Design a protein with these regions (language model features):
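Surface-exposed beta-strand/loop patches in extracellular or lumenal glycoproteins
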Residues: 207-224
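Catalytic-domain carbohydrate-binding cleft regions of carbohydrate-active enzymes
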Residues: 1-193, 198-200, 206, 225, ...
């Protein structure tokens, strides 16, 4: 019944199929063929009574992927289609797990803080979502849902960081996440370029073991230099990398 992007008018489909089922069954005495709306139970029952399979189910031993439904017709394009959306789903999944971890250490954390992001990431596991085989307007909607869910989780993340990190300020700090790193943009870090104000940023490792890696932080071009220190005041190795973009440099550092 229907096919991709075609099964939209259910009533029309059922009206037409009802007529076909009725006609097939009216001449079943001559043709030996009957028709009905079946279920998975009907299918399994029919397969079990099929003489060709009662002796044993066929065993597939070669590769399943890439799938092909005809000569030289491999279903492999979706491995790389819509890479930006694939990356967005992956980074949002990482964000979700990190927020879950931090909320576990936060008293009275809202139970629904991550629900919108969880629901959005659940929807994009559909085989026509993360694969990138959806219509463009649907891809936009998936990204919008993830963005809304991530923004909701960011509020809980900021509250969790304020609880876990010591602060001398009487007012809570509003922590902002660099959510546009894929296009080398981080508004919080670039906004303080050219000022003497220090920039504090939190780096969270959600893994079960310590890791050392290089982090890239976009900064503005107006400042001559930066010094990166850890919470104890120890300087971290860092270098300024020029960017072709008009307002951005990269500040990679080891942490």
């Amino acid at each position: 019944m229907g096919s991709d992007y075609q099964y939209e008018a259910a009533e029309e489909w059922f009206v037409n199929l009802d007529k076909l089922v009725k006609h097939v069954n009216e001449v079943s005495a001559k043709t030996g063929v009957t028709a009905k709306y079946s279920t998975m139970a009907d299918y399994v029952k029919a397969k079990r009574t099929d003489a060709s399979v009662t002796a044993g189910w066929p065993l597939k031993t070669d590769d399943m992927f890439p799938y092909a439904d005809g000569p030289h017709m491999f279903w492999s394009g979706y491995f790389t289609s819509r890479p930006a959306l694939k990356r967005y789903i992956r980074t949002a999944s990482s964000q979700l797990q990190s927020v879950r971890h931090l909320l576990a250490f936060t008293p009275s954390s809202p139970l629904d803080a991550t629900t919108p992001l969880e629901e959005a990431l659940g929807v994009v596991q559909h085989h026509d979502a993360v694969t990138g085989t959806e219509m463009q307007h649907v891809a936009f909607d998936y990204a919008y849902r993830i963005h809304k869910g991530a923004a909701h989780a960011d509020d809980a993340l900021s509250a969790a960081l304020n609880h876990l990190l010591p602060s001398k300020s009487p007012t809570p700090t509003t922590w902002s996440r660099c959510e546009l790193l894929n296009v080398s943009v981080c508004y919080p870090s670039q906004a303080k370029t050219g000022t003497s104000l220090p920039l504090e940023f939190a780096v969270y490792n959600p893994l079960a073991q310590p890791v050392t890696t290089y982090l890239h932080l976009p900064v503005g071009k107006a400042a001559a230099s930066y010094t990166v220190v850890d919470p104890s005041g120890k300087k971290l190795p860092q270098v300024m990398v020029p960017s072709e973009q008009q307002v951005t440099n990269y500040l990679p550092f080891n942490a």
